[in-house]
């Protein structure tokens, strides 16, 4: 009762929602584990990705709340302004990449095509018929999942460069530092992904690749937060 009257009602609602999401995350976690208890010893990559996505979503909500609390502000992540579309699109792509990263992990898709920049001798995996859209949309196929995961990384990089060119063009000097921090992390993440692949998924490198995604989301949100005036 004390906190109900002392804490801003909107903040209280937010914390209750986080509590509900954490409880739901527990349910999703059990749902994931249950997929490996019957007829298989590994878990469904779809359920794994759902569990991971929920974790990152909760983490992102808390980080955004922390930024507002620290700066005594009330910035809205869903602010509907065209100038922020490219940054929001970048964050969307990063979350999509995390999902496909879970697919790669769940399917052990990193154990095939362990070459870069080509997938063996070709840009496209040679065991997929890209003329048949059903094969390309088969997210149970290791080759398809790895191909999409690779190319999402390229897309994220080019979108980020586009954002950087706009920052330079419009001389948004207050974004130079957060942009460079994020740029360094993106380069590190890409390098770790490549090294994990060509090292036959060395456990340390693969783990660092996964862990660094947490910092990537943190600094992406920091970059977006500072871009909102």
Map each language-model feature to its residues.
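Polytopic transmembrane helical bundles with strong interfacial aromatic enrichment
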Residues: 1-229
């Amino acid at each position: 009762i004390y906190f109900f009257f002392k804490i801003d009602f909107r903040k209280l609602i937010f914390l209750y929602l986080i509590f509900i999401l954490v409880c739901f995350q527990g349910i999703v976690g059990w749902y994931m584990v249950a997929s490996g208890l019957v007829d298989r010893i590994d878990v469904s990559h779809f359920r794994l990705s759902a569990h991971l996505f929920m974790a990152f979503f909760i983490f992102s909500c808390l980080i955004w709340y922390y930024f507002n609390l620290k700066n005594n502000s009330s910035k809205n992540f869903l602010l509907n302004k065209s100038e922020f579309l490219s940054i929001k699109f970048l964050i969307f792509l990063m979350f999509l990449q995390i999902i496909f990263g879970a697919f790669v992990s769940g399917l052990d898709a990193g154990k095939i095509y362990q070459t870069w920049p080509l997938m063996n001798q070709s840009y496209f995996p040679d065991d997929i018929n890209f003329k048949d859209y059903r094969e390309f949309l088969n997210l149970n196929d290791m080759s398809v999942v790895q191909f999409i995961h690779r190319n999402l990384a390229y897309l994220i990089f080019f979108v980020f460069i586009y954002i950087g060119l706009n920052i330079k063009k419009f001389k948004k000097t207050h974004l130079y530092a957060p942009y460079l921090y994020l740029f360094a992390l993106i380069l590190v993440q890409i390098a770790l992904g490549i090294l994990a692949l060509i090292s036959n998924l060395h456990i340390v490198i693969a783990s660092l690749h996964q862990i660094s995604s947490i910092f990537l989301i943190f600094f992406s949100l920091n970059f977006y937060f500072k871009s909102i005036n």
